[in-house]
Every structure is written in C-alpha cells, then in structure tokens.
Amino acid sequence: MIRQFFSVLIGSFVVTASMMHALTPAEKKIADEARSRYYNLQASGFESLTCDVSYDLNSAPFSGLPSSLKESLSLARVTLKINDRGIPTVNKQLPTSIQKDTFDQATQMLNVMSSLVEGVFQTWPTKGFFGPIPPFDNQINAIKTTPEGYVFDLNVPGAPVLIRTDKNFVTTQITSVGGRVLEKTIYSPSDKGLVFTGNGALSKRDAEAPIEVDYHLDTQVLDGMIVPAGVHVTVKPNIDARYTLTSCKILRSAVIQVK
C-alpha cells in the first residue's frame, strides 16, 4: 500500500517538456517571480548527496517487533543517494551473520523500511529540488490570477496538476489525478528562499478507502547547501516512523554566473 500510494503522487506530478506551450509575457513574469521565491538546490551546483539511513526502531511499525528482530534490523545498512536531477536510489543490505530464523522476517521489515525512504524521496524532487514551479516555461500550460493568488496549470500527460499559491507565491495546495489527490505542502523560510519541509497528501480513489500520508523534513547545511537531514512520516492508521540521514557526503560543481 505504501509503494502504491507514493507511486500515485509520483505519477501525478511528473512534468514533461514535450508538450509545447508559450506563456504570455505576463504569465512568464509571474512564473519567474514565483520561482525566485524558492530555494533552488539544482542552481546551487548540487551534484549528489549520499547518506546512511538510521531508523528509530521505537517508532511504528517497528516498536512492537520482538527484540531479536529489532536487533537484526539495527544491523541492516540502508543508504540513500540523490543524483544531480534529484532522483533517489535506495540500497539496503542485511549482514549474512543474522540467524536464519529471523532473516526472512528481517528482510520483509527491511523492505518496509526502505519503502518509507523511497516513497518520500521519489516525491521530493518536484517540490524540494528547485521548488514547486517547474523550471521550464513549456512545462506550464497556463497561469491564472485568483483573489487569493495564482493557479499554475502544469503540462502533465493524462492528469492535469494544479498548483495554488497565495499572492506571495507560497504554495497552499496541489491537486492532481482529476482532483482525487490533494496535497498541502510546507515551505519554511531561509536566507536562500523557501525550503521544502513537509507535505500532507490525501488520496480519494474510486471504490477504495482514502489514504492519508504526512511527512515532515528536518534540514541541514552541507557545503553551503540546504539538504534533508531527517524524516517523520505517517501513513494512517498504523505507520508513524522516523529516520535520520547520517554520515552524509555531498558533491557540488562550480556555478558560473552568465551575464
């Protein structure tokens, strides 16, 4: 269920540059101003981030596990790597020294643990890598002014995505999949712009019970760049998990300003 729900968020918010559309001069001005409000990790020269993932095994769904199984999981190694496009790769490994009677159970739980990392960070690029507004104008179908602020209609094959902002371009709501997926993002101020620090998503699928996911991100500064440091993710009603990113290594390239 976890992977299925996060895949809905990923699929509903993959922008494409193939559907050409020219913004009007007024729309382009709005788009440029909106982008400037958000911290752009990509523009800072980000190349990659590699971290170990350390889980709080006293958080759900791990807290009720037998102590022997929790001990086995504490020996597992999970790593997260985010590349220069913001795309994550999660690797996981259990030591072969774990007793056979707990190895299969530990493997099953490790899959759950890694899915909580994959799910969050597969949805992260379109909100946290360069902000919620796509970097290219042809990824935006139209921009409308509303009494509350603005609505950005994105070019997404099969399922339009609408991003609503206030008059200061702070995102207040994202709707997708024909209005069946509703997201409310959290952006926190910094001296480099608004930084993505959380998301609440509700999926109301036909003939299925609604699924609600919330996650909050702690951040850290590495080599002058603001990147994730930890996650608190809840999937109602039975997951309330926490993990931190440790031993992080970051690579960056020189940014050349073209005048």
Annotate the PLM regions.
Residues 17-59:
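N-terminal leader/targeting segments and the immediate start of mature chains
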Residues 33, 129-140, 179-182, 209-212:
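A short, amphipathic edge element
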Residues 42, 70-71, 78-81, 136-145, ...:
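Short, exposed beta-strand/loop patches in secreted or surface proteins that constitute
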Residues 8-17:
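Bacterial N-terminal signal peptides
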Residues 74-132, 155, 160-162, 177-178:
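An acidic-aromatic
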